[in-house]
A protein has these predicted regions:
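Short beta-strand->loop
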Residues: 90-99, 112-113, 141, 211, ...
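Sec/Tat signal peptide C-region and signal peptidase I cleavage site
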Residues: 15-19
Length: 328
């Protein structure tokens, strides 16, 4: 039903007459409504958007066969952006603002850029763990311990770019054999895989699960102020990936799309985006917000972004072969 609804929404977008000064966006980013409102205020360009995870966007792009129903892809896991580039589904655009973005956070050929950094961490429900006599897991090894059987929730990496980034990071850090052995143990604690990256933290908030693997953005960290939950980075190693953005090949509103990329990478745009969903940003000189917990940069896994993207199909095929029965 949800897929049908998404298709209907996109169909409605396609049938609508979009004049100059409009922009159609698929987005997987916290605070997007206010971000787009500020962009519209600054540029006069009206934004129509729909929320969709990165894996869903990639599948839809391929099905549209060069006739995209949107102009810009904003947010989501970088693996899908790299796959889309390799399949010829993205428009090359080197924004002048990219001079202030380190090369490790953007495509050297100009097909995508990072917006912010997504780090992967844990969220625990303190009351649930206390009731069950459990300590909060401190490391990835802890998370796979038998004591957390059926207590861990995480998103399906085939759909959630954040969770695919976690899988790819750990494979790159541990090596294939050790990583897949680890995932076998971890998945014994995971009764099912959620469809979206934002679903696991909410299931911990409501007490359905004691522990979640989450993207460590302000959107979820701020839940600590309202609920008995704690968010934190693993003590052993921190998976990470840039949240991407790109223009679709054959975008109808290309000029508006380019203006959005310029704005989102500008000092003004990066500040607005950071303030609406606090994260570490990609542009040089943009301060990390206080709400984002202190990051031990030495704990970030040393990853190859190209490997993360180019190995996506191989990694997900192996994941689905082993754990596909857990997909929700």
């Amino acid at each position: 039903m949800k897929k049908i609804l998404l298709a209907m929404l996109f169909g409605a977008m396609t049938l609508t007459s979009f004049a100059e000064g409009k922009l159609k966006v698929v987005a997987a980013y916290g605070g997007k409504e206010k971000i787009f409102q500020q962009f519209s205020k600054d540029t006069g360009i009206e934004v129509d958007f729909i929320d969709m995870s990165s894996g869903e966007v990639l599948s839809k792009l391929q099905a549209e066969k060069g006739k995209p129903s949107a102009d810009v892809w904003f947010g989501g896991g970088l693996d899908s952006f790299i796959s889309a580039k390799n399949k010829g589904l993205l428009e090359k655009y080197i924004s002048p603002e990219m001079e202030e973005v380190p090369l490790k956070y953007r495509d050297k050929d100009g097909y995508w850029s990072g917006v912010s950094l997504v780090l992967v961490g844990f969220m625990v429900n303190n009351e649930i763990l206390e009731d069950r006599g459990l300590e909060a897991p401190k490391t990835w090894a802890d998370l796979a311990k038998e004591e957390y059987r059926d207590e861990v929730i995480m998103a399906n990496p085939a759909i959630s770019g954040t969770n695919y980034a976690m899988v790819s990071n750990l494979i790159q850090e541990m090596g294939d054999e050790k990583a897949w052995a680890y995932f076998e143990e971890l998945n014994k604690n995971v009764p099912f895989l959620a469809k979206r990256g934002g679903e696991p933290p909410m299931k911990v908030v409501t007490g359905e699960f004691g522990v979640a693997v989450i993207p460590m953005s302000g959107e979820f960290i701020l839940l600590e102020e309202k609920y008995p939950v704690t968010t934190y980075y693993p003590e052993d190693m921190i998976p990470w990936v840039p949240a991407g953005m790109a223009i679709f090949k054959n975008a109808e509103n290309l000029d508006s799309a380019k203006k959005f990329i310029d704005w989102a990478l500008s000092e003004k745009g990066q500040t607005v985006i950071r303030d609406e969903d606090p994260r570490a940003m990609v542009r040089n000189g943009i301060a990390t917000p206080d709400v984002v917990k202190k990051i031990d940069m030495d704990k970030l896994i040393n990853i190859d972004i190209d490997v993360l993207g180019n190995d996506r199909e191989k990694v997900l095929n192996e994941w689905n072969k082993r754990f596909g029965n857990k997909a929700k």
